[in-house]
Amino acid sequence: MTNFEPKKLKNIWTIEDSISTYNIDKWGDKYFSINSKGNISVTKDIKSENKIDLFKLVKELKSREINPPLIIRFNDILKDRINALHDSFFKAIKTYKYKNIYQGVFPVKCNQQKNVLEKIIEFGSQWNFGLEVGSKSELLIGLALLENQNSLLICNGYKDKKYIEIATLARKLGKNPIIVIEQRDEVKRIIQAVQELNATPLIGIRAKLSSKSSGRWGKSIGDNSKFGLSIPEIMLTIKELKEANLINEMKLLHFHIGSQISDIAVIKDALQEASQIYVELCKLGAPMQYIDVGGGLGIDFDGTKTSSNTSTNYSLQNYANDVIATIKDSCELNNIKHPIIISESGRAIISHCSVLIFNVLGTSHVSSKLQIFDKKNQQLIISNLLETFYELKKLKNKKINLSQIIELWNDAKKFKEDCLVAFRLGFLSLAERAYAEELTWACAKEISKNLNNDAINHPDLSEITETLASTYYANLSIFKSIPDSWAINQIFPIVPIHRHLEEPFCKGNFADLTCDSDGKLNNFIDDGKIKSLLNLHKPEEDKDYLIGIFMTGAYQEALGNLHNLFGSTNVVHIDINQDNSYKVKNIIKEDSKSEILQLLDYSSASLVESIRINTESAIDQKKLTIEEARKLMDQIEISLRKSSYLSE
């Protein structure tokens, strides 16, 4: 096997090294970088030089008692994403001489927070940007927030009689709801509502496409997809709308090919099929005006620009070009007027603006020191393990033969296994077993210190890195703040927000606060590759080590749950000023323990009273003094008002 030079440490760690290690310049989309102080910086928009220091911001928020874990939302980035989406479509419309407009909507399910939706409507108002809703509750939000009478309100999801009645009558308020038929029985309900209410809604149809999708949400398309009408069902629906004299209200064709589509070829295939369906609907006599291409516009979480589940092999402009060009070609071939194009791009709009910040509470790692052990009474199997360790130490600063290293490591593993067998049979003491494990770790450390990355990643040695990895204990709940990481193994960019002038020598992963073995983060973006460990710094005593999880704006807050009763974190909305300062626009305080318990039907007052009765009983039995009881009750009442997360 190949001989390797001994591992050499880098003399100076630079900002460029950190940018490369964490791939920030690739996934950051120019919104995130590292400043001269070694801290993460946040840019106002991709064309701006206005930046703020994220680490400084978090420290100053702490001085206001807004502590991690917290979500920081940058309004300027949200605005820039909306601008970028519209700019891309406007450029495509101009390039391809498309004879109509783009008019987008934001899917409320991506982030239902009131402050978020208000900002989206504000930033998109110049383009009549609307909302897409998928339930009666979301419909009520849309009707309340959308005041622009030119904005669209796309009504998707399952629809009962009340849903259809509300959407139908809302048209008389000057709103623009379009009821999208996704199930056959909705046709009958719409006809019934028209007859009973003396009002007519705008109508759309969602088509089930036969085009094949890809990625995690590939089953959103095809004959067995959850929503939409098959082609025979569409034909029957058109017939029934004509018979009910409602065909003139049929305005929109909608399709959806899934979320986070990574391959542009999938989008092109779906567009070609849907465009032809649109053309045929026009030929059947429906006065069509809109084609809603749904969601699916992906973002590049890992920065690789590939067709992997966590990336995309296309840009925002590529996407807009293909949408415009494909629809135009189909319409012009059939002498059909170009429709208004709608998209429901949620993730691409909302993801970048949110950063989840948490602090590290502590770490655990393999022992760095060997115990002093009595060699006279040492068992042979332990002596063999110790001899292997000494053989590895002799290789320090020498040219290393990889086959020799692999042989010694295999010996160490075998001797350790022999020790475990001996312990189970009662031939080794607990202290001897501990010494054997420490010797094995010491062997792994000697190999790690001497081999470069290429060698240590050899299949026969790769487990060494895992063996030596540290666990960093994170002050957050994965199930509450980033549930997609647990549920679907979604990978988010995770980066320390400071100390980037120092080399991150440690390899580690994160464990959250919950009592659940799934509460771990162990998939990371490392130099453009997905790895199980992240380069991290050793936390400094009495100093915060702050980590950022980026691109978390879509779905996470809506999907988060109360596992172990960890509640919502602090949320702060920030505006970046022209002078590189910032303004705190909104603060949404975290859930207190009392508020969380109330959600589950517990009365804080009743709980306190129940515990107080127990303390009185303990006082009577001389188990507790009055002073101890008072202190306990004070702590409980204070705790109920405080965060569910750990504090200093």
From Swiss-Prot:
The modification N6-(pyridoxal phosphate)lysine is found at residue 109. Keywords: Decarboxylase, Lyase, Magnesium, Metal-binding, Polyamine biosynthesis, Pyridoxal phosphate, Spermidine biosynthesis. InterPro entries: Ala_racemase/Decarboxylase_C, Arg_decarb_HB, Arg_decarbox_C, Arg_decrbxlase, De-COase2_CS, De-COase2_N, De-COase2_pyr-phos_BS, Orn/DAP/Arg_de-COase. It catalyses: L-arginine + H(+) = agmatine + CO2. Pathway: Amine and polyamine biosynthesis; agmatine biosynthesis; agmatine from L-arginine: step 1/1. GO terms for molecular function: arginine decarboxylase activity; metal ion binding. Substrate binds at residues 291-301. Its cofactor is Mg(2+); pyridoxal 5'-phosphate. Its EC number is 4.1.1.19. Pfam families: Arg_decarb_HB (PF17810), Arg_decarbox_C (PF17944), Orn_Arg_deC_N (PF02784). GO terms for biological process: arginine catabolic process; spermidine biosynthetic process. Belongs to the Orn/Lys/Arg decarboxylase class-II family. SpeA subfamily. HAMAP family: SpeA. Catalyzes the biosynthesis of agmatine from arginine. This is Biosynthetic arginine decarboxylase.
